[in-house]
């Protein structure tokens, strides 16, 4: 296993789980986020190579960051996470920049973005592409 993926699974996810509502802390969610992180950055790049995305889950400021901050399903939990992590400036610009340097914040935002999909997470690995495509919109 990629040593950074091990770090994310063993250290980042447990810390993120403590900051998020209990309903978001499911094995299916963490598996899905692991697959997304491996797809987006291979857990090697916190800043997109030749691009604007930040964090292992490759958030863009005007896309995923704004979506998490504004979506009805995620905004209150996002504010709570930011408060608990002592981020006073919650502008999309500042949060976007912070995702590159705070893996727990990035994991929380990735879980919150996945939460906005408003569909249950698939139980079959072969169905995992749908929520990824719906929320990350890669390409």
Go through each PLM region and give its residues:
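Peptidoglycan-targeting cell-wall enzymes and recognition modules
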Residues: 2-11, 38-118
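Acidic helix/loop microenvironments that form the catalytic cleft of cell-wall polysaccharide enzymes
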Residues: 37-41, 121-139
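Catalytic phosphate/metal-binding cores of nucleic-acid and nucleotide-processing enzymes, i.e., regions
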Residues: 3-12, 16-27, 35-38
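Surface-exposed patches in mature extracellular/periplasmic domains of secreted proteins
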Residues: 20-33, 46-48, 121-128
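Generic secondary-structure transition motif, activating predominantly at the C-termini of alpha-helices
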Residues: 17-20, 73-76, 86, 136-137
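Structured segments of extracytoplasmic/periplasmic soluble domains
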Residues: 15, 19, 39, 113-117, ...
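Amphipathic alpha-helical interaction segments
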Residues: 31-35, 108, 131
């Amino acid at each position: 296993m990629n040593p950074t993926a091990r770090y994310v699974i063993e250290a980042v996810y447990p810390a993120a789980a403590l900051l998020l509502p209990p309903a978001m802390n499911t094995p299916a969610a963490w598996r899905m986020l692991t697959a997304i992180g491996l797809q987006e950055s291979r857990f090697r790049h916190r800043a997109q190579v030749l691009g604007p995305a930040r964090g292992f889950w490759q958030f863009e400021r005007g896309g995923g960051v704004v979506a998490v901050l504004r979506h009805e399903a995620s905004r209150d939990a996002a504010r709570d996470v930011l408060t608990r992590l002592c981020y006073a400036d919650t502008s999309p610009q500042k949060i976007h920049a912070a995702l590159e340097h705070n893996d727990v914040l990035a994991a929380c935002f990735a879980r919150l973005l996945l939460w906005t999909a408003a569909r249950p997470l698939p139980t079959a690995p072969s169905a995992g592409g749908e929520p990824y495509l719906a929320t990350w919109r890669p390409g």
